[in-house]
Regions:
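Conserved beta-strand in the GNAT
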Residues: 47, 53-61, 68-73
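Conserved acetyl-CoA pyrophosphate-binding loop and the N-cap/start of the following alpha-helix
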Residues: 78, 82-90
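Conserved GNAT acetyl-CoA-binding A-motif
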Residues: 95-108
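C-terminal "cap" of GNAT-fold acetyltransferases
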Residues: 109, 129-142
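Short amphipathic alpha-helix that is part of the acyltransferase structural core
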Residues: 1-45, 49-51
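Conserved acetyl-CoA-binding loop of GNAT-fold acetyltransferases
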Residues: 117-127
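Short acidic/glycine-enriched loop/turn segments that link adjacent beta-strands
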Residues: 40-42, 65, 130-134
Length: 142
């Protein structure tokens, strides 16, 4: 069973960072200095566990353009088990409760675009490349 919590302890934050390290740096070859950034201290972080094992992470932060969802990561062995869906639902629930009038957006990696479309996001603008990975900006329409 999947459980998603808002990170409140250093231990949970370390677990989220470890998941991001495995997915983005090791698996996708994103430079480590690009994966961790200056927004870590202001972002709201989330950690997913599956049967008690940390397996997914995400964060969101306020920007001048609205609320940006970022760093969604699920370990390979836990994909296709609705972990990503549970993280997204938890994050959206918190974001919409705290910021009902703000636009919610994210930059989706190409393989994840259809996942986000199924959950109420629409593409905006042209495809772009960040850290050698193709992305689309997507806006939450609900």
């Amino acid at each position: 069973m999947t459980e998603v919590i808002r990170v409140k302890s250093e231990q949970d934050l370390d677990a989220a960072f470890n998941i991001r390290e495995q997915v983005f740096v090791q698996e996708q070859k994103v430079p480590r200095d690009a994966e961790r950034d200056q927004y870590e201290n202001i972002a709201k972080h989330y950690l997913a566990t599956y049967d008690g094992v940390p397996c997914g992470a995400a964060r969101w932060r306020q920007t001048e353009n609205g609320i940006k969802l970022e760093r969604f990561a699920v370990l390979q062995n836990y994909r296709n088990k609705q972990v990503g869906e549970q993280i997204l639902k938890a994050v959206l629930e918190d974001v919409k409760a705290a910021n009902p009038e703000k636009e919610v957006y994210l930059n989706a990696q190409l393989p994840a675009v259809n996942f986000y479309k199924r959950h109420g996001f629409v593409e905006e603008g042209d495809m772009f490349t960040e850290c050698d990975i193709k992305h689309y900006k997507m806006i939450f329409k609900g």
